[in-house]
Regions:
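Anion-recognition interface
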Residues: 1-247
Length: 247
């Protein structure tokens, strides 16, 4: 059997150069892209940035503030000094999927790109996985175990997280690298808890939905199929309009 080598990176879809670089490295590569409802994806993405490092990737813990700050950040203001991927703070760009998918279609051809929806994966993970196996030319009639992984997590004690993140380098050097790694791993697990993500504010939902809803038809045309979040986005704008009329 011929082995399949895979690589998964978070920002390859967002990157303007990744598609051409992958093509250069592996001309016959097959690309798998998973897309999610922008409302859900951006809320989860923001929570992950906040969790990654206290104040480093995203110091604005309120997603509404982070969403509004994007306009200023794109002209060089309110940028966290220690953020690792500046474009990760451009929420509107992150979930504008059409130009991103188009780059891969244009570079590899549509037949070499498999786009799957998170909604389908959540509803039937096994069948979605088999679809991917078929695309890769792998045996797909196999038993699959698809447990839920990577639930939403939060930091129990932010003060502990801050202290660990700001230990002086001179003090760190007193201890072996392996021991430091074990310490961070153990403390990190103790200081982390699984917590359901709170409901997004209805007005914020309306604002985000109003931005992405008009962009959904272009994605549908590109992919040649219906987009599962088209109606939910439209409904999110209408629900808040109804609330406003009642008030």
């Amino acid at each position: 059997d011929t082995p399949v080598i895979a690589d998964a990176t978070v920002y390859s879809l967002l990157s303007k150069t990744a598609a051409s670089e992958i093509k250069l490295f592996s001309p016959d590569a097959k690309i798998i892209i998973m897309l999610r409802n922008p409302l859900e994806m951006l809320y989860a993405h923001h929570a992950q940035l906040v969790f990654n490092g206290l104040g480093e990737d995203e110091p604005l813990t309120d997603f509404a503030e982070a969403w509004q700050a994007e306009c200023l950040r794109r002209v060089g203001h309110q940028i966290p000094p220690e953020t690792r991927v500046l474009e990760a703070l451009y929420y509107r760009v992150l979930a504008d999927y059409t130009p991103q998918v188009s780059r891969y279609y244009g570079t590899f051809g549509a037949s070499a790109v498999q786009v799957v929806f998170y909604d389908d994966f959540k509803r039937d993970a096994a069948e979605t996985t088999r679809t991917i196996f078929r695309f890769l030319g792998l045996e797909h009639e196999v038993a699959l175990d698809t447990p839920v992984i990577n639930p939403n997590t939060v930091v129990r004690y932010p003060s502990i997280r801050w202290v660990i993140a700001h230990i002086p380098s001179g003090f760190k050097a007193l201890f072996p690298k392996t021991l430091r790694g074990i310490f961070r791993l153990v403390v990190g697990r103790i200081n982390t808890k699984v917590s359901p993500r709170s409901e997004m504010d209805a007005t914020l939902q309306r604002d985000i939905a109003a931005y992405f809803s008009p962009r959904t038809p272009a994605l549908s045309t590109l992919l040649g199929r219906a987009i599962p979040w088209a109606e939910p986005l439209l409904k999110a704008t209408q629900d808040v309009d109804e609330i406003g009329r009642e008030d």
